[in-house]
Amino acid sequence: MTDTTKIDYSKTLYLPQTEFPMRAGLPQREPLFVQRWEEMNLYKKLREQAKDRPLYVLHDGPPYANGNIHIGHALNKILKDVITRSFQMRGYNSNYVPGWDCHGLPIEWKIEEKYRAAGKNKDEVPINEFRKECREFASNWIKVQTEEFKRLAILGDFENPYTTMNFHAEARIAGELLKFAASGQLYRGSKPVMWSVVERTALAEAEVEYHDIESDMIWVKFPVAGEVATENDLSGSAVVIWTTTPWTIPGNRAVSYSSRIEYGLFEITEAENDFGPRPGERLVFADKLVEECCAKAKLQFKRLRSVSAEELGKIVLDHPLKGFGGGYEFVVPMLDGDHVTDDAGTGFVHTAPSHGREDFEAWMDNARQLEARGIDPNIPFPVGDDGFYTKDAPGFGPDREGGPARVIDDNGKKGDANKVVIEQLIAADKLFARGRLKHSYPHSWRSKKPVIFRNTPQWFVYMDKNLGDGTTLRSRALKAIDETRFVPAAGQTRLRSMIEGRPDWVLSRQRAWGVPICVFVDEEGNILQDDAVNKRIMDAFEKEGADAWFADGARERFLGARAGEGWTQVRDILDVWFDSGSTHTFTLEDRPDLKWPADVYLEGSDQHRGWFHSSLLESCGTRGRAPYNAVVTHGFTMDEHGKKMSKSLGNTVTPQDVIKESGADILRLWVMTTDYWEDQRLGKSIIQTNIDAYRKLRNTIRWMLGTLAHDEGENVAYADLPELERLMLHRLTELDELVRSGYDTFDFKRIARALVDFMNVELSAFYFDIRKDALYCDAPSSIRRKAALQTVREIFVRLTTWLAPMLPFTMEEAWLDRYPQSVSIHAEQFRPTPAEWRDDVLAEKWRKVRAVRRVVTGALELERADKRIGSSLEAAPVVYIADKSLSDSLEGLDFAEICITSGISVSDAAAPEGAFTLGDVKGVAVVPERAKGEKCARSWRYTTDVGADPEFPEVSARDAAALRELQALGKL
């Protein structure tokens, strides 16, 4: 080589080389992977690969087949996907069968909207034609949502999903109902249910949401019946109740009190209003509430005496509407009720068993005693399904001049019922006071209109009937809850409290699109128990679907020879929660690729009252235990300020928009870094935070790929590895334990945080930074370089597989860049970690080394900031260490290499005044000094041996030796 030959030293370095782009381009690149996975049928390949492994089953809670997916769907499906992928990569056959909930009111509502727009009347359309349109509507949205889920990288058996409208599913749902009928758990009763006048159907609690409304409130006088109270001064007095539903007064049958409350008899002394109580009237109130009530009515009063609970229990009252419309001539008993408080009102509760759950329960608890007292215990039906009063509300129903009054009209608007009832109470001199109140009130989640409680004939499942083995459905469900794992644990308490307090399960809906309550009954509501009839029903549903129940001639077809016996065919359909609660039967039990019970159910926290709840009841009622071993819940997604997302507020974030602008892996990273079991926040700034975190992660992966381009797969024996490499392998053992534990406990945030911190803090800012010199500049034969490549290789394989369930697109891209002949990273397993890699003693030593290093780097940062050095390689600091355990930790190490300086001196002398220190590292001080020698043109390190090799006068002896080796290999 001549003196005139100029070497381009950058071409002699092992610099990173990769086609893995720095800019991810996820919106454009991700669909290519979706297409690749589809073309290779990745899901099927994984099933074949894992066919001999133990099954792990997450049973998919079915989303509703109506509309595009929203951010809640994305959160839910991503969490499920991470679970199934992580178990697949840890040695399980982790199947995922997606499902859809297809029946129910929302779809009916959409078809009815279409009819209304076309001027068609739904009632004039044959029911099976209507059901056909509902089925087609659901099918279309299943196709749309399938593609949207695939775009999120959800991996599942989308070619063979389950749907609740599949003929086999409908047959199985019907079969589950017939099991309840056969065991005597199903009964026809009447009960106040939440009723949507607009939709003409009963609603489950899960279908109701609460909004503030302003209502009439009234205080009403119930006179003490004279013939009962002649022996004391309660004769001629009245008990006062308070209600925010004046329209329920015609349904009143009792007044409830509490034996825990102190009551008094009060006399009115002055009255300002022209209507209402007059001076001299005597009224009974709770002592705590009389002043507030009388102030509302502008009355002055005096207390006459106490009234005991025993006394209240003996009297009966006259109905305030007594005689109106020729009705209300019955007496109104006083009932002791646990639900009565003196927090508000009068201390007495107007009890209308037709219009309230607690009212109903209080009435039924006392039914036998009431009947013994000559009081009719039957519960009336004062309001019809159309919101009009019936004949059971004399004077307000069909007998009323001008027609019956109405509680709510077809548009969900308040009718005239409150007005006419209040007017009649005034006319009867039974109104104590009136006012307006803003309060929370139930509304249909679909129509957004108020609902009412009304007594209706419905089909129920008993919660407390003895099932023949000493258990009840409630006791079975509570036992199952205790045997189930909940994440978070608070979910167990929440579901338990709901089961403990819930009433009998209402199964019926008065709609068209659903699985029918396929039973026949006599006039008393007794169910026909006939195996041959049931078999004909099940066989027909299996072949034709539940439409068979509504076809012409269905009654005769199914009853066969018993058609002449007078059995009535029930036309109600099942609540959709019974549908979804039965999915475990036709998926987990019936599919050979699944198993019963499921390992886990995962849904939003609202499903404690929804799918978790109905699945638990259905399975406990028919199989005696829950259909799941674990229940995982997530919260709801709010905007970045913690407000509920709403189109009207313009603060919604759609998964489609995030994917289009940033990519699905960004959305998945957001899910993985949230406390998903709580309510999460999402908005532009939060998305940007995740984009920034993703870029750092991607650049770390990219650097490893570029570095590994020079990896020839050589391995250095563990015993020969430098300490720094052994430290990194030790960290992999710790992370391996954390990752596996995190996936087991569904603690994804812990995994994501740990891996991101490892990549940013321990790799990019520590290990990679230190080893760049060896990786780029060392000779091909260097053990140090080979050891570093081997370690980067081990880190890459583990990081990418650990992250693959979370970021499937990016990790697939990185894996195929490194291993282009591979099927997919998702066909890989988490690598086992050799036990010898664990070295806690070494880790403790390096904790001390890194503490000293932090003081050095802190001192050099100040030097850089003050422009005294440009690079740490220009420095050769002096480190003063007073703590012997810290100085001992540096023995045998090239501490200059670790600090990325060209030299370093360690002294046990006292540090000079002004030396740099860190408060949290005691006994260490640093005095920065410039490095001696010349700058190597190849490595940029300052050494005193630059030019030692005359053939390479610009470089250090180390670099000259590397160049000679490259030259010998023909690479220079």
Curated annotation (Swiss-Prot):
Entry's Gene Ontology molecular function annotations: aminoacyl-tRNA deacylase activity; ATP binding; isoleucine-tRNA ligase activity; tRNA binding
Keyword annotations from UniProtKB, A to Z: Aminoacyl-tRNA synthetase, ATP-binding, Cytoplasm, Ligase, Nucleotide-binding, Protein biosynthesis
Domain of life: Bacteria
The protein's enzyme class: ligase
Main location: cytoplasm
EC number of this enzyme: 6.1.1.5
Keyword ATP-binding carried by entry: yes
Cross-referenced Pfam families: Anticodon_1, tRNA-synt_1
Catalytic activity: tRNA(Ile) + L-isoleucine + ATP = L-isoleucyl-tRNA(Ile) + AMP + diphosphate
Cysteine disulfide partners in this protein: none
GO cellular component: a single term: cytosol
Keyword Protein biosynthesis: yes
Summary of subunit composition and partner proteins: Monomer.
Family matches, as HAMAP family: Ile_tRNA_synth_type1
PANTHER family documented for this protein: ISOLEUCINE--TRNA LIGASE, MITOCHONDRIAL, SOLEUCYL-TRNA SYNTHETASE
Notes on the domains: IleRS has two distinct active sites: one for aminoacylation and one for editing. The misactivated valine is translocated from the active site to the editing site, which sterically excludes the correctly activated isoleucine. The single editing site contains two valyl binding pockets, one specific for each substrate (Val-AMP or Val-tRNA(Ile)).
Family, similarity comment: Belongs to the class-I aminoacyl-tRNA synthetase family. IleS type 1 subfamily.
Name listed for the protein in its UniProt record: Isoleucine--tRNA ligase
Lineage: Bacteria, Pseudomonadati, Pseudomonadota, Alphaproteobacteria, Hyphomicrobiales
Gene: ileS
